[in-house]
A protein has these predicted regions:
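N-terminal active-site beta-alpha-beta segment that forms phosphate/nucleotide-binding
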Residues: 1-85
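Conserved phosphate- and dinucleotide-binding cores of soluble alpha/beta proteins
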Residues: 53-54, 59-214
Length: 214
């Protein structure tokens, strides 16, 4: 399944982007540690690296740092050139033309194509849209919930404050500071350039194309 997701996504980007080396940004972890094979979003990146010279910018994915701790390790194991990007720097890197495409995994997709993924994904999609570069979300068809009309119906988990107040046992802020720590955010379908599952590619992303890949 993940191999097909990877090949479909890589073929699309290879065909649509200008020839030559590429820089792709990703967020959180969507590789073998989160799925089977080489993963979903990272599976697309790995397959694309077999077609083009590729450099990957992996966002940290605070506060649990899945990008820094997991994705960077997987990219190294795959032999893909990469660098770690500060989360807050990512939109600016996109705006200044240092990124050719953004590729992420996904946690849930509504019937209209709204995508829930690791918090911070929405900001990357906004930046990609403003810069006119592809934002691709990749995942299994089982993550598509046709019973959900739109992303506003997706429940967003609010995680514990201590994940933000401290890191690796070191306090980062004033003890007891109130914290907002949503685990996910929702990217509207209008910002998703393409949605990839093992059943195909939804593009443009709308109710009909999403149903076809669910």
């Amino acid at each position: 399944m993940c191999e097909r997701i990877g090949e479909l996504g890589a073929a699309l980007l290879d065909a649509e982007l200008a020839p030559g080396p590429l820089t792709v940004m990703t967020h959180c972890n969507s590789g073998a540690l989160a799925a089977s094979g080489r993963g979903t979003g990272l599976g697309v990146i790995a397959a694309l690296a077999e077609r083009r010279p590729l450099h990957v910018l992996a966002c940290e994915a605070r506060p649990l740092l899945q990008g820094a701790r997991l994705t960077v390790w997987e990219l190294g194991r795959l032999g893909i050139e990469h660098a770690l990007a500060v989360d807050a720097a990512a939109p600016g890197l996109i705006r200044t033309g240092q990124v050719d495409a953004v590729v992420t995994g996904l946690d849930r997709v509504a019937a209209n194509g709204d995508v829930a993924n690791k918090v911070g994904t929405y900001g990357l999609a906004l930046a990609a849209g403003a810069a006119g570069i592809p934002f691709v979300a990749a995942g299994p068809s089982s993550s598509v919930d046709l019973g959900l009309a739109g992303g506003d119906a997706i429940e967003i988990e609010e995680r514990g404050a201590d994940e933000v107040r401290a890191a690796l046992g070191t306090l980062l802020t004033v003890p007891g500071t109130p914290v907002r720590n949503p685990a996910f955010d929702v990217t509207p379908a209008a910002l998703v350039w393409a949605l990839v599952t093992e059943r195909g590619v939804a593009r443009p992303v709308d109710a009909a194309s999403v149903a076809a890949v669910a």
